Curated annotation (Swiss-Prot):
This is Formamidopyrimidine-DNA glycosylase. The keyword Hydrolase applies. Its EC number is 3.2.2.23, 4.2.99.18. A zinc finger (FPG-type) spans 235-269. The keyword Mitochondrion does not apply. It comes from Salmonella paratyphi B (strain ATCC BAA-1250 / SPB7). Monomer.
């Protein structure tokens, strides 16, 4: 599933081609996604795009009378086309722009979403979200307050959007390795120093992935159709049985909430 760096990479890739241009029309080939494509999107015509924003893993296209909320789901991706290339099987949505560009949404598993809302505030998919991990609000003090009485393993807690948004399976594993914290540790067992380190490491890992264009494991592509390159820098994720790049111990794997977790038995305590 695309996580925060992949969604932010997509946002940065499509923004220059959309902002200041006008949506001439939308071509919906298959509107049966996780939720049906909103009727308002079918009716788009001569609609300027004012901004392209992100909240958690949602892309937000600001229009004069409302917002398009896009979620990439498990396997979705967005590409900017310079010409109307023939659509393939999983190309479900096109936004045809006044500048000759086409924003094409591809989603093999159809678990993404294209929704319309008049106002963002209070929308059910955006309500109750925690802070952005790259914001000043997310820091060691905040993390310690939220972990202090939490009797659950730190790995799944990091992936809870009520704590912090956008830290999915890949980056939770990578951040815990970088901080030297075992994923099975109870959140409440983390010290002040560990919470401070973990908050800083999460920011650093996410920023590095954004710089590399995200992590391409299977379906994710950047806005220009190129893969992300952070996969080449993964320290533990997807490396079960391979030697730790720091100490040589074979990388171990376990599961939290049915999600694979990767870690080093020697480096993480």
């Amino acid at each position: 599933m695309p996580e925060l760096p992949e969604v932010e990479t997509s946002r940065r890739g499509i923004e220059p081609h959309l902002v200041g241009a006008t949506i001439l029309h939308a071509h919906i080939r298959n509107g049966r996604l996780r939720w049906p494509v909103s009727d308002e999107i079918y009716r788009l015509s001569d609609t300027p795009v004012l901004s392209v924003q992100r909240r958690a893993k949602y892309l937000l296209l600001e229009l004069p009378d409302g917002w398009i909320i896009i979620h990439l789901g498990m396997s979705g991706s967005l590409r900017i086309l310079s010409e109307a290339l023939p659509a393939e099987k999983h190309d479900h949505v096109d936004l045809v722009m006044s500048n000759g560009k086409i924003l094409r949404y591809t989603d093999p598993r159809r678990f993404g979403a294209w929704l319309w809302t008049k106002e963002l505030e209070g929308h059910n998919v955006l309500a109750h979200l925690g802070p952005e991990p790259l914001s000043d609000e997310f820091n060691g003090e905040y993390l310690q307050q939220k972990c202090a009485k939490k009797k659950t393993a730190i790995k799944p807690w990091l992936m809870d959007n009520k704590l912090v948004v956008g830290v999915g399976n890949i980056y939770a594993s990578e951040s815990l390795f970088a901080a030297g914290i075992h994923p099975d540790r109870l959140a409440s067992s983390l010290s002040t120093e560990e919470c401070d380190l973990l908050a800083r490491v999460i920011k650093a890992v996410l920023l590095r992935s954004i710089e590399q264009g995200g992590t391409t494991l299977k379906d994710f592509l950047q806005g220009d159709g190129k893969p992300g390159y952070f996969a080449q820098e993964l320290q533990v994720y997807g490396r079960k049985g391979e030697p730790c790049r720091v100490c040589g111990t074979p990388i171990a794997a376990t599961k939290h909430a049915q999600r694979a977790t990767f870690y080093c038995r020697h480096c993480q305590k």
